[in-house]
Amino acid sequence: MANIVHSKNILIEFTRTTNIPGWLKELCYRTIDEGYLSKKSLKEVCDIFISDGEAVMQEPQEIGTEQLILSKLIHTAGVNALVENSEIVFCPEGITLLCGSNGSGKSGYFRILNHIGGGFIEEPLYPNINEQNPKAMEVSLEYTVNGSGIQSYDCSCDEQEREIEPFSRITLFDSLYANEYIRECSHNTYHLRANGYFDLYYLRQNLRRLRNRVGNICKDKVPALKVHELAKLNMDVIYEEYVKALAIEFKEELKKLINRSLHVEILSVNFEKNRPSFTVRLDKPYHVNEILSEGERKCVSLALLFAEIKLREDVNPIVLDDPVNSLDNEIIQRFVNRLLELPNQIIVFTHNYWFANMLMEAKNVNVYSINSGIAQRTSSKKHLFAYKVYSHRNEKGLIVEYGQENSSFHLSIVKRCLERMPFVNADALIAADHLRHAIENLIDEKIFLNLTYFRSYPL
């Protein structure tokens, strides 16, 4: 595998070793932090340039020097119709699986992580529309960095809290991402947010915008923006090396998923709405949609995702929402095998019970209780926490540990409903729902002894 250095680190090293002015150092720091600069940030850099001041921002942390681990997500109130005071304890050293039917509310939790982590596709968070006076959004995320003590971040889910450190290191993927990655157009393109090398292109764009701004304010200062030191970055050469390495890894990852070689060539990078996308060409003169099935197009987007993670040697969390839509069972099995090879902390939301059982029953997986301590999780196999996500009436995102949604669990909810004072009609409806589930579970537990038939598949 090629030795690829993250472009954020290249920019940091550039600011250290070169005697550059304060405004350029500030421009590099803000590009690392924001990518394509906001108008406010661009104005602040421009002010430093005009005043010939020093950089204001602190030097960012190098990528790869810190590892983020998510410990717990707590939803207190206010996001969509998610039940209040719900929490998900993540498996820090393995996989966290959350399985629930469509409409159960599991994607609400993904959207929280997508918002905080700054996912490529913005999926808005709304207050609970079932309430006349919706509560403010309250979310907490517990995490560690480099194994340090647990820290907590309280989030109200507004726009200013999108893509903030250290959560911008999370890799996020869902079905909407796949639809964006594989889209039929004139050049057979699909879109992947590449976190490895586009900082250099953002810097070039931000510098051009800064020149335009300075030119509108004081043209006589524009010549001072010609920075010969930038030539040392060799942006085009660095990017060419990255694309070649990515193409090799991409083809290998694709073959692992669909079990056959596709002649796919990564040509170049484009920018649409300030977001980078790869242009992809098939060797044969057909459109992508005529060559690949819907499931295989999904595989292409997943393969690119895995290729870049591998190329960057990224060990930060990966969060996937329904990644196996449209995939047949053989491809799902290969996808499971690939997930189990990754060293990252992985969080998976899915409504596919076949996929969930493949993960939980794989030979090299050990399912642990969420109450188990790290000292108890001694197996050399991949560790996994599993949850069931379900809904009742207008309550979404109810969480129970997988396998614990038994008759006793449902009867305990019935008991709580019957003990509520005052007892209202809504309590009766919820109690009736859970009583029916309790009876169904009792039949499974006492008559069928929890035996379930699954079609055999290779492990």
Question: Which sequence ranges carry the predicted segments?
Answer:
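Long, non-membrane, amphipathic alpha-helices that form coiled-coils
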Residues: 4-25, 42, 66-69, 160, ...
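Conserved P-loop NTP-binding catalytic core
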Residues: 46-51, 111-163, 215-223
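Conserved ABC ATPase signature
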Residues: 98-107, 277-304, 323-327
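Conserved D-loop/post-Walker B switch-helix segment of ABC ATPase nucleotide-binding domains
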Residues: 315, 327-334
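C-terminal lobe/lid and adjacent interdomain/linker elements of RecA-like ASCE P-loop ATPase modules
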Residues: 1, 6-7, 11-17, 23-38, ...
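Pre-Walker A (Motif I) flank of P-loop NTPase domains
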Residues: 92-96
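GG-anchored amphipathic helix commonly corresponding to the ABC/SMC/Rad50 NBD signature/C-loop
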Residues: 112-115, 294-317
